[in-house]
A protein has these predicted regions:
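N-terminal pre-triad scaffold of radical SAM enzymes
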Residues: 52-88, 127-130, 136-140
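A short small-residue
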Residues: 85-91, 137-140, 239-244, 282-284
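Conserved Radical SAM active-site core
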Residues: 87-197
Length: 330
């Protein structure tokens, strides 16, 4: 498959299933049969496309459209080792560093490819429902933690410039992060570039206690560091929280753990933090560990309701594929 040639520049940014929020319909469900066709597309988030090494398109359930992923960790290095992660870190991966010029060229070409509609003529995206045939964002995520990239601020600024050159100011720039590195100066500069270019931070928070955090994330980074970083970031701008809950060895998170999760959200708000949305979701692709399974749609809905009632924060549900058949979750 060939991508369009790079255009002259003018002088002028981490699961599948269908979303629901408070029982209300969303665009992905509004088209009946079309909403059913979207499921296979949502479940395959390949991080390669054509001959690209760093930039890849996905149909994102949380974005309600096409998201252009920017993979800053092609070597699969991550400072978390989450039990539910879809990235296979057991295989020896090729050591590849980010080639800035190659990334710039790929993003430039992919923006043209999506905005022209050519992407929807490919076999991978030809079944995309009409309502989702739109570029929603450029997302910095990929096979590891993007903020560990040493030139993080530079890459954010450069991608913002490319987005502006394509007059794609309506497209967001989304950082999907575990928030572990937000305290570093060059990362804070990158977050400020996001603020100036229709940016949004989606930070992971999936535990209420240190014990559960260590069980799920498997990292030496202290839970308190993550909480402090999220609090500081949320004081500076409203952020989105991503919270994935699952069954571990057949057991969903306890009521006590979920209550502690709500307490952490309330503590962040009490310290001046602002939330746009809490995304509550579950496992939708093959996890790292076989003892990890999705919770049911009902269980996801109950967590959404708990967040709304206990915290007064908007929350949205994203379900696992086939999870309606699950039972026994609280």
């Amino acid at each position: 498959m060939s991508l369009p040639p790079r255009q002259p520049q003018s002088a002028e940014p981490a699961s599948a299933g269908l979303p629901n929020s408070g029982g209300e319909s969303l665009p992905a469900r509004a088209e009946g049969e079309a909403s059913l066709r979207v499921v296979p597309l949502h479940t395959h988030h390949e991080r390669t496309f054509a001959e690209n090494r760093f930039v890849y398109p996905v149909l994102s359930r949380r974005s309600h459209g096409i998201s252009l992923g920017v993979n800053l960790n092609p070597d699969k290095v991550c400072n978390f080792d989450c039990i539910y992660c879809q990235v296979d870190r057991t295989r020896q991966s090729e050591t590849r560093f980010v080639d800035m010029q190659a990334l710039v060229d790929e993003l430039d070409s992919m923006l043209s490819f999506v905005r022209s509609g050519q992407i929807f003529k490919t076999s991978e995206f030809q079944e995309t429902p009409t309502a989702l045939r739109r570029l929603n964002d450029i997302a910095f995520s990929g096979d590891g933690e993007p903020t560990t990239y040493r030139n993080f601020d530079e890459i954010i600024a450069t991608c913002a410039d490319i987005k502006a050159q394509h007059h794609a100011n309506d497209a967001k720039m989304v950082l999907i992060s575990n928030a572990s590195m937000f305290h570093r100066p060059h990362v804070q500069r990158g977050l400020e570039y996001l603020d100036r270019n229709n940016g949004e931070i989606w930070a992971k928070l999936e535990a209420g206690t240190e014990e559960y955090y260590k069980l799920v994330e498997r990292t030496p980074i202290p839970f308190r560091q993550v909480l402090d970083n999220i609090t500081d970031a949320a004081r500076r701008r409203p952020i989105v929280i991503q919270a994935l809950f699952m069954r571990i060895h057949g057991k969903p998170p306890s009521e006590q753990e979920l209550a502690a999760f709500a307490d952490r959200l309330n503590e962040i708000r009490a310290a001046g933090g602002q939330f746009k949305l809490i995304q509550v979701y579950t496992v939708a692709r093959q996890p790292a560990e076989s003892f990890v399974e999705a919770i049911s749609d009902c269980a996801v809905d109950e967590i959404v309701e708990m967040v709304q009632v206990r915290c007064g924060i908007p929350a949205q549900a994203f379900y696992g594929v086939g999870s309606d058949d699950l039972s026994g979750d609280v």
